[in-house]
A protein has these predicted regions:
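Bacterial N-terminal signal peptides that target proteins for export
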Residues: 5, 11-28
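Residue-level detector of intrinsically disordered terminal segments
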Residues: 7, 14-17, 36, 102, ...
Length: 441
């Protein structure tokens, strides 16, 4: 019941004014009821599949950033990461010696004279057969105190399964002493390499989102193409493609009033041009700084595009959401929240999608002391998800996930240890999809 300036509720003492916290909760509930969001539909808590044994590699170095993970068609895992030891920075790669098994000896990707820029995100990694591609940031040789974050974006390649790497090639085609970073890397079904990154070459307050391609297995890079401007300066980009050759790039865009939205732009000509971006979740999150939290994408055989991302929305409550598009990125479904814990802070969501439309989403759950890695799974193209499941045993962070065409998923994350660090990997084989995605027409 409402009176002027008051909200009245029934109690044993009759009608009394609702407390201020109560009014806030009521208003939040009314607002949330109007938002275009599907409430979480969680399947049974039992995992619909089988997790393989955990494989742990120790890294007795001062600092480690990563990992990135890929899994080949035989089930062997690949990792890329950055490490610093005795003031020497290195971009590293390792490949499993058998499906789901131990990792082989690590290989240094960069030349000794090339000093990697120490950044928060792992090198981007693509593995197909004996072809291995890695993008990473080179500390700009002309960096100044006024431009301490200046970098050059580099692409390294191996054609012998990662045993050796060719000298890296430059990705950005401008000479500016600026930042070219927060990159993503993807190889489509026809072998084209697609690269996306954040670029400040125009000198504006907010940088732009740029893309390029390699059509010759990483030997050369095409001219750089600006997709959009007003990009959030440090939320990593994402790039993927569909079975019909459609290419998608995602990033966080800044709108008027410091509103930050996850957006997706699509290319209908294999990455030569891109259409204007489309807002995914309509979060209306006002935040006058960079959240440092990227989006992640995947596409199934039928062409459904899935996006996961982090936002705090209008209620300023941290959350991880998933949405999908069935019209090649023109519009998106209502968003669905995946995190359920009320005592932790969800972070760093990543998604992998197999051809049948089975999804694995992995993210961090941070508390005042603990830091966990959790996973939620859908076997029905996102209709329902399993209750989030904890994967780690010790304080962990930066989880990643990948999948091969056989539907075997690879999970990886970094575990804090003394006196060094550990990278933990694990495979996941899901049960067959109840209704598999049909091939795109």
């Amino acid at each position: 019941m409402f009176q002027r300036g008051k909200v009245m509720i029934q109690s044993r003492r009759g009608m009394v004014p609702m407390s201020r916290p109560g009014r806030r909760a009521l208003c939040a509930g009314l607002v949330l009821g109007l938002l275009p969001m599907i409430q979480p539909a969680f399947a049974e808590t039992a995992l619909p599949g089988e997790l393989g044994p955990k494989v742990v590699t120790e890294h007795k170095v001062k600092s480690l950033v990563g990992p990135s993970v890929q899994i080949d068609e035989a089930g062997a895992l690949s990792l890329a990461w950055m490490e610093e030891d005795k003031e020497v920075r290195s971009v590293m790669y390792a490949r499993g010696t058998e499906p789901g098994g131990p990792m082989g000896a690590p290989v240094r990707i960069n030349r000794p004279e090339d000093v990697p820029y120490w950044r928060q995100e792992a090198p981007a990694l693509v593995v197909q057969g004996d072809d291995v591609f890695v993008t990473w940031g080179l500390a700009h040789p002309k960096a100044t105190p006024q431009q301490p974050f200046a970098t050059e974006l580099r692409l390294s390649r191996s054609i012998d399964g990662g045993k050796t790497f060719h000298p890296s090639v430059g990705v950005n085609d401008d000479p500016g002493v600026i930042q070219h970073t927060f990159d993503a890397l993807h190889r489509d079904a026809d072998g084209r390499l697609h690269l996306s990154w954040i670029d400040g070459r125009e000198g504006k307050k907010e940088p732009g989102t740029y893309v390029a391609r390699s059509l010759d297995r990483g030997v050369t890079i095409t001219r750089n193409l600006k997709v959009d401007e007003g990009t959030c300066v440090c939320c990593r980009t994402a790039v993927t493609s569909g079975p019909d050759g459609m290419v998608y790039v995602a990033w966080r865009k800044i709108f008027e009033g410091s509103v930050r939205e996850t957006v997706v732009a699509r290319s209908t000509d294999h990455g030569e041009t891109f259409e204007p971006p489309v807002i995914v979740g309509h979060d209306k999150w006002v935040f006058p700084a960079c959240p440092h939290r990227p989006a992640s994408m995947g596409v199934d055989r039928q062409g459904r595009l899935y996006v996961v991302w982090y936002t705090e929305g209008t209620d300023e409550i941290p959350a991880v959401y998933v949405a999908y598009s069935d019209d090649r990125g023109r519009t998106f479904s209502p968003k669905r929240q995946l995190n359920v814990s009320r005592n932790t802070f969800p972070d760093h969501p990543q998604i992998a999608v197999d051809p049948e439309g089975r999804l694995v989403v992995i993210w961090e759950e941070q508390g005042p002391v603990k830091r966990d890695v959790v996973m939620s799974v859908s076997t029905d193209r996102g209709a329902a998800f399993t209750t989030p499941r904890k994967l780690n045993e010790r304080k962990s962070q930066t989880p990643v996930v990948a999948v091969n065409r056989q539907g075997v998923f690879a999970l990886a994350w970094m575990e804090h240890a003394m006196p060094g660090h550990k990278i933990v990997t694990q495979t996941l084989r899901l049960s067959p999809a109840p209704v598999a995605a049909q091939a795109v027409q």
